[in-house]
C-alpha cells in the first residue's frame, strides 16, 4: 500500500511540475524575443549620420561644369572659360570693355570661330566641324588654352581680332573659298556701350553684322578681393544669346552659303521643287518675311509671288 500511495503521489506531482515548466517556457520565449528584438534597434541619430555622407557624395557627383557660356554660374563655369581667363590673372585692371571683348571671343569659339594665328598653331589638333553644327567641346577646350590675340588701338577703346571659321575635313581649300571663311571682329568702346561688328574679310562684298551691348550690364566695374575674375560677369545667358543671334550664327550661315554648302538639316537644304510646294501655303506678308532671310529664299519667295500674279491675270 505504501508503494502504491507513493506512486499515486508521484503521478499527481508530475503534472504540477510540468505545468510550472509550461508556464516558464512562454515567459522565456517572450524574454528571448524581446532580447532578439532589441539587438536590431538603432538610434535615429546614428542612422542619420550614416546616410548624410552618402547624400552629400551623390550631390557632389551631379554638379559638373557646364559646357557653354550661357549656363555659367558664380560657382560653376565652363572649362574653356576657366582656361582662357586664368591666363589673365595678372591683368585684373583691364577695362571692363576689354573683358567683354574676351567674353565675345569665348562665344565665338562656341560658334565655330577661332583666331587665325591660333588656328595655324593648333590646326593639327582640331577636329572637323560639320556644316549643320558649330560647337565642338574638344576643339573649344584646346583653342581656349591659347590667349586671345587681338590689336588694341585708340587708347584702349578699339579691339580688333581676325577670325577663321572651322569646317569639316571635306571643305575645299581653294584660296578664294578660304578667304570666304575669314572675317574681322572689331569692338569699339563708346561710353557705356560696346559696338561689336563682325565683317567679312576684303574683298568680299557680303554684308557684315553688328550689335550694341551695355558694358555695365554684363561686366561689373569692381573686382572683389580673393574672388575669381568671372565673379564680375552677369547675365551671361543673355549675352550669349545676343552674340549668337546677331553676329556669329548669321555670319557662319552666310559663309557656308557662299561656299554652296547645304546647311542641313534646315530649310536651305531642300530640293528646289519643294520650295514652291511649301511657299504656296504662305500669304503675301509671310512671303515678305521669308524673302528677307537671305538671297536664296528671296528668289523663291519672289517666284511664288510672280506665279500667283500670272495665274490671277490669266
Swiss-Prot record:
Major location category of this protein: cytoplasm
Residue ranges, annotated region (Required for interaction with skpA and Cul1, but not with PI31): 257-314
Domain named F-box: residues: 264-309
Gene3D superfamilies assigned: 3.40.1000.30
Biased composition (Low complexity): 21-34
Keyword Cytoplasm: yes
Keywords, sorted A to Z: Cytoplasm
Disruption-associated phenotype: Male sterility.
Record bears the keyword Cytoplasm: yes
A GO molecular function held by the record: ubiquitin-like ligase-substrate adaptor activity
Record InterPro entries: F-box-like_dom_sf (IPR036047), F-box_dom (IPR001810)
Locations listed in the record: Cytoplasm
GO cellular component: cytoplasm; SCF ubiquitin ligase complex
Descriptive protein name: Protein nutcracker
Organism whose genome encodes this protein: Drosophila melanogaster (Fruit fly)
Gene that encodes the chain: ntc
Amino acid at each position: 500500500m505504501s508503494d502504491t500511495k507513493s506512486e499515486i503521489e508521484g503521478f499527481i506531482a508530475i503534472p504540477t511540475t510540468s505545468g510550472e515548466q509550461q508556464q516558464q517556457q512562454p515567459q522565456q520565449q517572450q524574454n528571448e524575443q524581446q532580447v532578439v528584438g532589441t539587438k536590431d534597434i538603432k538610434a535615429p541619430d546614428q542612422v542619420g549620420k550614416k546616410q548624410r555622407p552618402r547624400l552629400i557624395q551623390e550631390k557632389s557627383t551631379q554638379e559638373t561644369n557646364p559646357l557653354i557660356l550661357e549656363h555659367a554660374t558664380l560657382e560653376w563655369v565652363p572649362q574653356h572659360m576657366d582656361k582662357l581667363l586664368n591666363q589673365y590673372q595678372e591683368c585684373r585692371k583691364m577695362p571692363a570693355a576689354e573683358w567683354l571683348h574676351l567674353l565675345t571671343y569665348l562665344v565665338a569659339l562656341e560658334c565655330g570661330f577661332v583666331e587665325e594665328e591660333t588656328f595655324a598653331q593648333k590646326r593639327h589638333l582640331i577636329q572637323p566641324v560639320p556644316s549643320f553644327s558649330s560647337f565642338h567641346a574638344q576643339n573649344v577646350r584646346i583653342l581656349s588654352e591659347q590667349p586671345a590675340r587681338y590689336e588694341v588701338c585708340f587708347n584702349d577703346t578699339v579691339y580688333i581680332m581676325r577670325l577663321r571659321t572651322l569646317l569639316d575635313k571635306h571643305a575645299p581649300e581653294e584660296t578664294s573659298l578660304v578667304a570666304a571663311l575669314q572675317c574681322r571682329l572689331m569692338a569699339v568702346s563708346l561710353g557705356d556701350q560696346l559696338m561689336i561688328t563682325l565683317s567679312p574679310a576684303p574683298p568680299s562684298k557680303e554684308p557684315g553684322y553688328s550689335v550694341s551691348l551695355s558694358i555695365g550690364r554684363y561686366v561689373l566695374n569692381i573686382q572683389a578681393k580673393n574672388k575669381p575674375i568671372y565673379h564680375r560677369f552677369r547675365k551671361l545667358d543673355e549675352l550669349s544669346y545676343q552674340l549668337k543671334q546677331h553676329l556669329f550664327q548669321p555670319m557662319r550661315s552666310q559663309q557656308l552659303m557662299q561656299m554652296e554648302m547645304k546647311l542641313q538639316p534646315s530649310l536651305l537644304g531642300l530640293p528646289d521643287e519643294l520650295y514652291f510646294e511649301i511657299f504656296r501655303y504662305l500669304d503675301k506678308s509671310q512671303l515678305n518675311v521669308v524673302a528677307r532671310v537671305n538671297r536664296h529664299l528671296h528668289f523663291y519667295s519672289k517666284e511664288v509671288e510672280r506665279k500667283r500674279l500670272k495665274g490671277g491675270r490669266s
